[in-house]
């Protein structure tokens, strides 16, 4: 469950072009994206208890509510107006705007339906330590690394539509406490994630001009996959293997 904050990449082929970099990015996603994690296989296959699904949704909320914080930091890294304008819609996608709901609102619909107290969810007091450390590391990464790497770290969205579709169909099929309204967050991301990923990919293809910069882009994606994988490692250790750390949420069916 280690989190490597400075991953290194030794590509099998030289990153001597944007196409070579994109091929490598897609290889990284195929090998490292968290759709391969055993916890997701359990979740989508209907093999978790209601309490385990509660634990997943509670911990994932910290990631969801931190995404607009991360995006605000990304915006602050750029002097050019065009990039800031392009990135700004991501804040509204998650935070919402006056009179419209955002992704955080839709995630709270899910936690409400699972029977979690909304104040408890929003306080994030019951999340796993590894969840907090991994998500905070992501926010710090986009703050501390280059603007190019900040954008590149978002490229996991290239692989997100598949897992969202799998989650929608799997959870609707297997859990009687889930319905289409509850899954609205994932339904919306089916259209939002490809749009965001397309822009980020175009950006890194244009702005990563040297083999070193292309390697940095690939390393940023590796880092982000580690952030996602670490969260699931922690959930599996705590709620499947039963090693819940002190102070973390304990579902009723584990008490």
Curated annotation (Swiss-Prot):
Pathway: Cofactor biosynthesis; pyrroloquinoline quinone biosynthesis. It catalyses: 6-(2-amino-2-carboxyethyl)-7,8-dioxo-1,2,3,4,7,8-hexahydroquinoline-2,4-dicarboxylate + 3 O2 = pyrroloquinoline quinone + 2 H2O2 + 2 H2O + H(+). Its EC number is 1.3.3.11. One of its GO terms (biological process) is pyrroloquinoline quinone biosynthetic process. It comes from the Bacteria. Keywords: Oxidoreductase, PQQ biosynthesis. It is an enzyme of class 1 (oxidoreductase). It holds the Pfam family TENA_THI-4. The keyword Hydrolase does not apply. One of its GO terms (molecular function) is pyrroloquinoline-quinone synthase activity. Ring cyclization and eight-electron oxidation of 3a-(2-amino-2-carboxyethyl)-4,5-dioxo-4,5,6,7,8,9-hexahydroquinoline-7,9-dicarboxylic-acid to PQQ. Belongs to the PqqC family. This is Pyrroloquinoline-quinone synthase.
